Amino acid sequence: MKVRASVKKICDNCRLIRRRKRIMVVCSNPKHKQRQG
């Protein structure tokens, strides 16, 4: 899980979702997991 100020889709499988008022990226590739810090 990467914590970043700006979250972006890295590949086509990445999905932007909102969870508990946080923007997150979920993907089939675990390296692409991000959340906004």
Curated annotation (Swiss-Prot):
Keywords: Chloroplast, Plastid, Ribonucleoprotein, Ribosomal protein. One of its GO terms (molecular function) is structural constituent of ribosome. It comes from Physcomitrium patens (Spreading-leaved earth moss). Belongs to the bacterial ribosomal protein bL36 family. SUPFAM superfamilies: Ribosomal protein L36. The gene is rpl36. GO terms for cellular component: chloroplast; ribonucleoprotein complex; ribosome. This is Large ribosomal subunit protein bL36c. The keyword Ribonucleoprotein applies. GO terms for biological process: translation. It is found in: Plastid, Chloroplast. The keyword Chloroplast applies. It comes from the Eukaryota.
